[in-house]
Regions:
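C-terminal cap of thioredoxin/glutaredoxin-like
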Residues: 2-6, 29-35, 40, 64-66, ...
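Residue-level signal for pocket-adjacent positions within structured domains
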Residues: 45-47, 133, 194
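Structural alpha/beta surface segment adjacent to cysteine/selenocysteine redox centers
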Residues: 67, 73-151
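Glycine-rich, flexible loop/turn motifs
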Residues: 48, 108, 160
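Extracytoplasmic thiol/disulfide redox context detector
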Residues: 2-3, 9-102, 174-177, 181-182, ...
């Protein structure tokens, strides 16, 4: 299957991302670092933010996630729907999804999500949700899964291959992840910034609900 071999080669070219994660040390914290991070996290770097919710919402949540991260998938499937219903759709929260691929397969999936979304946040969140639901086959049968999901969103195999070979997109993805590691001190997934405050690791909806309710009372 020539396409599969070429496609695999394209994915393997993403190995630089995993190298980046391993070798870039976090910047040492300084006085006022938390306020500085809150300012930095508010602005996208290379890729435009994919966000749901009102821009003027009182709370902004930025999530850094990897499409091969089980805790990220659990958040997407079990927590995000309730967050969207109670807070995003009611104008209380603006939710921003940013990529932090922890391996080559997650990087390829992130690139596909960007290509499918093409600047449309609703479409982007739709494919990200599908990729999380298909996480097991994404990890075990990466090529077939990316092609199948791409096909579901109207991309043939040639278009999927072209997407994961897009050097400009890869460079932007790499730059954004480098920024998250160096400037924001993000080290793992999921990492959340809620109005600039970093929260690491998985959260139940009950934990997140309590946090957001407290912020809205201020």
């Amino acid at each position: 299957m020539p396409l599969t071999r070429r496609f695999l080669g394209a994915i393997l070219c993403l190995a630089a991302l995993s190298t980046l994660i391993a070798v870039v040390p976090p910047i040492a914290a300084a006085a006022g670092a938390e306020n500085a991070i809150a300012t930095l996290v508010a602005k996208p770097v290379s890729l435009p933010d994919m966000a749901l919710g009102q821009p003027a919402a009182p709370i902004t949540i930025v999530e850094y996630s990897s499409l091969t991260c089980p805790h990220c998938a659990a958040f997407s499937e079990n927590v995000f729907p309730m967050l969207q219903s109670k807070y995003i759709d009611t104008g209380k929260v603006r939710f921003v999804s940013r990529e932090f691929p922890l391996d080559i397969k997650a990087a390829a999936a992130s690139m596909l999500a960007r290509c499918v979304g093409n600047g449309d946040a609703i479409r982007y969140f739709d494919i990200v949700g599908q990729l999380f639901k298909q996480q097991e086959p994404l990890v075990s049968r990466t090529l077939d899964t990316l092609n199948a999901i791409g096909d579901h969103f109207g991309m043939n195999e040639a278009a999927v291959e072209a997407c994961v070979k897009d050097q400009v997109l890869l460079d932007k993805l790499t730059a954004d992840q480098k920024f998250a590691v160096e400037a924001l001190k993000a080290e793992a997934t999921p990492t959340f910034f809620i109005n600039g405050e970093m929260l690491k690791g998985a959260m139940s909806f009950e934990e997140l609900d309590a946090k957001l309710a407290g912020l809205l009372k201020r």
